[in-house]
Amino acid sequence: HKEYRRQRQMCIRDRDKVYEQLAAAEASGSAPRPARTGYVLLFEFADRSVETVKATASGRIPKRRKASGGNGGSAPDLDIVQTIQRRNASFERAVNELLAACAASGDDPVKLVYDAAAAHVPICPGAPRDAPLSPRTKRERFGALLSDPNARPSIVEVLQGLKEEPWWQDQIVPGGRRTFPAHEAEYAELATPLPEALARALQATHNVHRLYTHQAAAIDALERGEHVVVSTGTSSGKSLVYQLPIALALEREASATALCMFPTKALAQDQLQSLRALLGAYEPLEDVLVSTYDGDTATEDRFELRSTMRVCFTNPDMLHQSILPQEERWRRFFRGLRIVVLDELHVYSGVFGSHVALVLRRLRRICAALGNDSVRFVSCSATIARPAEHMGAMLGVDAGITAIEQDGAPHGAKEWAVWNAPLIDAHDPSQGRVSTYAEASRLFRHLVRRGVRTILFAKVRRTAEIVLRQIREDLVREDRAEVADRVVAYRSGYSVADRRRIEQDMFHGRIAGIVATSALELGVDIGRLDAVVMLGMPYTLASMWQQAGRAGRRNRDALVVLLGDPFPVDQFYMNNPELVFTQRDPPLVVDVNNELVLEAHVKCAALEVPIAPSEDVRYFGPRLPALCAALLERDGHGFYHYTDAPGAQPARELPLRGARQTSYTYVDATPGQPPRTLEEVEVERAIFEAFEGAVFLHQGVTYICTAVQHELCMARFVRANVRYHTRPRDHTDTDAVETWRIRTLPHADVYAYFGRVTISSHVWGYYKVDRRAQILDTVDVETPPLIRHTQGVWVDVPWAMVNEIAAHGINASAAIHAAEHAVLSLTPLFVASVSQDVQTECKVGKREYGGQSHPTRRKRPSRLIFFDKPGQTASVSARVFRHMDSLLRIALEVIEACGCVDGCPGCVETQACTEDNAVSSKHGARAVLRGLLRQPMFDEHDPPLDEQGHATSYLGPRDALTHTLCDAQPVPTAPDTEVHVEEITEDDTALPDMQQHAERPAPRLSPEPPAYVETVSPAPQPS
């Protein structure tokens, strides 16, 4: 080995010397053609981990392109021999197929091989070549290409050019290419024309001379006094639907005000500047104060804003916790309130949507108490099902809502491509697919080099940073540094100043491409974009269409590419691309009758304005009188007051999006420069990112963590140029620790339990991983655990059932995990929730499939467990507990009715799975549910063990199929507390509205997992 390294260094030194001589000769203009013998051609053979190959061969996908294996990914000698033999056989088979084909066609096989190899033969450095362009010339040419939108080729030409790339292997799946034709603009006139000066201001600031049909219809409806919801495509000019009515209302009444609510601060800032520009160009309103009022507003500025502001930009959280509780300070504003804007309506669903719906009812109630019945609500949304119905549920009104869904805005033709990374070896699919990071980099570079301004959406922050670094490195390697300088990342976590700078650079065309998370999914205007690449199937179909709408914002042709990950849900869509274009998410749901949510908001409302049940029942429903009697104090006039404690602030104790998290500050402590803050990161992320030795990426720059001060919530990083990233070695245990309630299910000895649940996350080390996902080193670290408390429901799976499943060659953990997914996906049938409102314990592939070669001492109880998102105050799991019998029955019906073989998003797989559905068995899930419902677990016609339906049968001995499980033991009750078994009632077994069930698309996806909290006490039981 030492001799090899010595010779290699000599070769490199000789090569560099020849390069220097050649450069000097070229500079003098007398460069002779050097002899070929003056060069040494170096080869490097980089093989994949054999254990990774074996994992893929067994039907499971390695998690997030990780290589499994020991220190460095080595494999036993026997595995290496088998791999070599298999590859020899593949090569021999390919040669024989070539010879047979040539014999039939009359071609010369040797000539074909030589011709095909020509493109792969390294070129001698001394071969004649064109003079290279200077870096300055390259920058100037590329800048000119970006500055002229018409200079780039058409999207059809760009796609055609893919076929000339050496890495092209027909990655667009069969049936995955679609063309959505261009749409011409449709205009309409307002029933009452705009004032001439306002029309001129609109032309000057927005370059709008005529209104589209949907804009005119919405403005006319608002002028008639109706509430309006506009559900049209991205970049269809929806903001004018509320900007113009606000201007008209402010001019009409000197005391009129408007309230604009946005789910994110970035979106609020974007629309704030747009409205300010319009009003500033309209002389009658040029002095109107338009401002934000949120958590960043300085305390000393708030009094003046409340007194003088006429248009307030805020968010639902600020309205709930700061504005409504100070009703007396906002009376001027509420009396004059004429327009309320609720942008991005599709965001408000599940528990968060239920909270916001009650906040809006409280707002309507305060305005009515002040004699203001002239408030009109206008909402904009991406395309959703039943927009009028959903807005009515949010506002608590049954009539007077106009829904506008016909889009009159123009758009260019849009090309869609469903793209699957190619197999590493077409003759040996067991080796898996090419890295999607590398595939995304190739596609992204192909686009931006041609002046196609591109945004690549990654599902998580870390992926965005890794892909950005790979794209930049690949561009520099191609000698295209001028392009690499114009590719940036955008995600939450960056400072406000950095994000505003990136937005402005993108808007003004100074950036060629951007790698982003869903932080750019909502409608912040970043200018013209030509292409969208989605790396991995988004968490919801609505998100997919929202991201796709980012392309083609300036009426030119555009491209959308859905690049599938190797995980089961993504591969389901790769194999069924028609579902990408035809499926839709289920209707959005809110539940203002949720006991805990309603109780909390009734307390808030009583503190704002005393409650008169006979009047306020229209806002809070028929349960209001009983709630007032139980929670509030009645005065002599029949009004109810909140008097729990002097100075109490119930709104402060009720976070709409879950409990506030502790944040860690990441500090750049690189020697030789002043310390600066990189990011502020929630604790549930920081525990997996910030430990000594961890590699952290920020804007594509690599940092290494040198110290973590948990008492100060601070982590220190220094810049380092390393060629690897780190992956934590961790585990998370979800344990039921205290039983509060027990219910019998109508099946003898099967029970459902409800109580306190603890979630403990531990990081005990990390892997150093190179860009090919090979493990370079294994390091141990000590970090404190992250412990969170919540409440949940669980059903124990008897050990006899576990043994029965293993006897049929199915991994028992895979069966239980798949059954949990099947039940979890159905919870919206009984309670208004999105999938992350209720969660489950997901199984890790390496641990579960390690078998006897990776024994574990950390046994997990054999049970189905579901729990509320930590920090949530709605107790969704309490309703899951109530309807557990129906959920088990419907889940079994869905699995048995699904036509897939190994599981799909329609039955046992979900995008919300934190382990990418690596541990899953459809047949096992069916057996678990049948057993809990006291039905025969297996049929005689079940497929034999070697068929595809038994994807986990390869594991061999029965112990290997249960080695991570133990018999679930009873969970104790609270000290000195006796819990009686509740009998199930007829209402609890009633099936939900099956029309809603029928509308649930087969591949039901779920939203991006939100952050957890550090420690949260269990929510109280309903009164």
Predicted feature descriptions by range:
Residues V375-S379, A385, G564, A606, ...:
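Extended, highly charged accessory segments
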Residues A388-A393, G400-V460:
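Conserved interdomain linker/interface between the two RecA-like ATPase lobes of SF2 helicase motors
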Residues D317-H320, E328-C367:
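SF2 helicase catalytic motif II
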Residues Q546-P587:
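Conserved segment of the helicase C-terminal RecA-like domain
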Residues V347-D407:
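Post-DEXD/H (motif II) to motif III coupling segment of the RecA-like Helicase ATP-binding lobe
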Residues K2-D14:
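Single conserved hydrophobic/aromatic residue that forms the stacking wall/gate
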Residues K63, V81, Q85-L98, C102-T213:
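Helicase-associated low-complexity/disordered flanking segments
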Residues G295-G336:
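Conserved helix/coil segment N-terminal to the catalytic DExD/H
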